[in-house]
Amino acid sequence: MILMIDNYDSFTYNLVQALEAAGANVRVLRNDAIDRAGLEAMADDPAAELRGIVVSPGPGDPDSAGVSMDAVRVAVERRIPLLGVCLGMQAMGAALGATIRRAPTLVHGEASSVRHDGKGLLAGMPTPFMAARYHSLSVAPETLPADVIVTARTEDDYVVMGIRHLSAPIEGVQFHPESVLTPEGPHLLANFLRLAGEGEASLLDRASGSFALAGFATEPSAAGAPNRPDRPIEPRTAAAAGAGRAEIVR
């Protein structure tokens, strides 16, 4: 079973629909419908068959995202595969001690060119690829702890688009893999299902490059952004203080 933490977002059920199309059993809980103790009990209950967690996009910031940050902490402690999407990635960063700050530009429904390291959930995806963005906050990379790395950035303004924990099976992406503006998004979701051991990931692999035709999401398409010269994904590393509430720089 994949647990979807719904941060009251319209994109949540696009994610659910895509995962279910690949045969995954998805249970959706609003971010205020369960607490950390409930997550721990679910993780420890063999009958629940919890194989992975997705923390959905949503409005606001990590501190207003209910159980989202605790979901990240439980996933790290229990080694449960977790994917954070948009606000979900910000919750991942904040839970692990990073600062969440204003993005250089507010982006709503635009496609950006994203370059990545080709590992983890990004394995097998072209670089760069076009990805949908809807956000005004971003993870400050210099505040990530040493065991969390940047995996993807936009080519134009170099905003962090992906992070990965080095010792736990959790990753976050700032872009929306479930959007028709991210044609390669199904492959990322397929990689997550493979990591979690849930569903038939190959069904999503076949949709890669034609997400709109597969019928998983419905936004209009957008023009692509120009490519930029190759740059490293991770320009520097820095340790951060322990996790608590999210530090939001406004």
Feature annotation, model-predicted:
Residues 42, 49-124, 128, 189:
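Cysteine-nucleophile active-site neighborhood
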Residues 153-199:
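A glycine-centered loop/beta-turn motif at secondary-structure junctions
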Residues 1, 25, 51, 81-83, ...:
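Structural signature of beta-strand start/N-cap positions in the alpha/beta core
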